[in-house]
């Protein structure tokens, strides 16, 4: 039995390692502007150089950019703490995602094939992805197996909410592919090193009300 104390929780998870490029810096950099011009000539809306830079165009035709900066789990945690926040624990994340459900998924023990699931376009569904909607707590959580969230328990980092897309990339299908978004899924073989993988690792800030009242 676990007690989940009152929390203030970030609605959507945040990406790691990427730092926004200012509009002015983007305009002044000739190399980046040449990359944008080349992309536009080819009808592309995004340019990605792995773990270096990402330039992307939004629906209003405006170009934005972000730079990749390698960081560690410990640096991320310290930065979060410096701003008065915390990372959720595994049990806290499970409750935020499942509300204490006794089933594999918050909606039951199997995949609902009427859902529109990301990375499963062969299901021939249109419109908004089902799991990208707010849950019972008003959170977007456990929506994409490629996006695993970093949690922290007494000196130990681990992941919840995804496996980095390993099951889907391995061709295991929709049920096994989406099993990692289950509140209770835990990959015991997943090794956690020192550095964060900015393409797959995300985080969510929380504030523990009891901690702030002491």
Identify the meaning behind each predicted range.
Residues 1-91, 193-214:
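Extended beta-strand/loop cores of jelly-roll/beta-sandwich
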Residues 32-37, 111-114, 173-177:
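Glycine-rich loops and low-complexity Gly/Arg-rich segments
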Residues 179, 186-197:
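Short proline/glycine-enriched turn/loop segments at secondary-structure junctions
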Residues 6, 20, 145, 180-183:
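Proline-rich intrinsically disordered, low-complexity coils
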Residues 54-171:
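Functional-site microenvironments in short loops/helix caps that host divalent-cation chemistry
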Residues 37, 98, 181-183:
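Intrinsically disordered, low-complexity regulatory segments enriched
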Residues 164-185:
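Short, solvent-exposed cationic patches
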Residues 3, 9, 141, 151, ...:
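Extended aliphatic helical segments
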């Amino acid at each position: 039995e676990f007690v989940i104390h009152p929390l203030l929780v970030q609605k959507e998870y945040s990406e790691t390692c990427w730092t926004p490029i200012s509009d002015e810096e983007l305009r002044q950099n000739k190399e980046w502007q040449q990359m944008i011009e080349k992309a536009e000539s080819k009808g592309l809306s995004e340019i990605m150089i792995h773990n270096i830079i990402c330039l992307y165009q939004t629906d209003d035709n405006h170009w934005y950019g972000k730079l990749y900066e390698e960081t560690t789990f410990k640096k991320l945690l310290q930065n979060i703490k410096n701003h008065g926040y915390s990372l959720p624990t595994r049990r806290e994340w499970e409750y935020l995602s499942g509300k204490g459900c006794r089933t594999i998924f918050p909606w039951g023990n199997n995949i609902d094939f009427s859902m529109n699931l990301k990375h499963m376009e062969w299901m021939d569904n249109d419109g908004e992805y089902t799991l990208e909607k707010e849950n019972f707590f008003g959170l977007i959580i456990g929506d994409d197996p490629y996006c695993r969230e970093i949690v922290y328990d007494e000196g130990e980092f681990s992941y919840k909410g995804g496996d980095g897309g390993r099951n889907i990339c391995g061709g295991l299908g929709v049920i096994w592919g989406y099993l990692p978004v289950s509140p209770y899924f835990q990959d015991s073989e997943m090794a956690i090193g020192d550095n964060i993988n900015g393409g797959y690792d995300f985080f969510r800030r929380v504030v523990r009300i009891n901690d702030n009242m002491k």
